[in-house]
Amino acid sequence: KNLREEDLLQSCRTAFSGGWSGVKLYFMLGLPTETDEDVLGIADLARKVYQCWRECTPNRARGVRITVSTSWFVPKPHTAFQWDAQIPVEEYQRRVNLLRDALKRDRSITYNWHDPQTSYLEAIFSRGDRRLADVLEHAWQNGAKFDSWSEYFDFHRWMDALSACGLDGDFYAHR
């Protein structure tokens, strides 16, 4: 988003100096050209935010909550990356594990990641065509309702609908 690291850290210093005790950092995994070094850079940045808290907070007894959240890159039409493929779920999970392991020892840093199944389905429909209309109808006829709510989401229902319509989700998400 064109935000310099120093600008982010200065904002954290200002917030911590003013008594704030929590920061949430959001990132996307799986962007084109991303490397393991980039993924580990997220952990490094979170640690730098923690250092800002240590340097600036007037009352360390309260503690600090730094939350790092990641989602899986979904290529969308009319964006700079519309023609780039979504990385396979196994690669996304490997990167999640890499970051989780890098943050494991940092008690003040919590790591959350987005469910890969919903992101995969989002990529399919973001890059889909008219053939997916039949998939939508089939999934709906088989009980898909309120699927953006995690308690109602059934990934297998959607995969069954794709299969019943003779379509492969990877064709849309990973091409």
Name each model-derived stretch.
Residues 20-28, 63-67, 106-108, 143, ...:
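Active-site lining segments that contact anionic ligands and/or coordinate catalytic metals
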Residues 28-31, 59-75, 111-126:
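A glycine-rich phosphate-binding loop feature that marks nucleotide/adenosyl-phosphate handling sites
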Residues 1-59, 80-91:
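Conserved non-cysteine loop/helix-boundary elements of the Radical SAM core domain that shape
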Residues 54-58, 100-110:
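Flexible helix-coil linker/hinge segments at domain or subdomain boundaries
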Residues 96, 105-175:
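Radical SAM enzyme core and accessory elements
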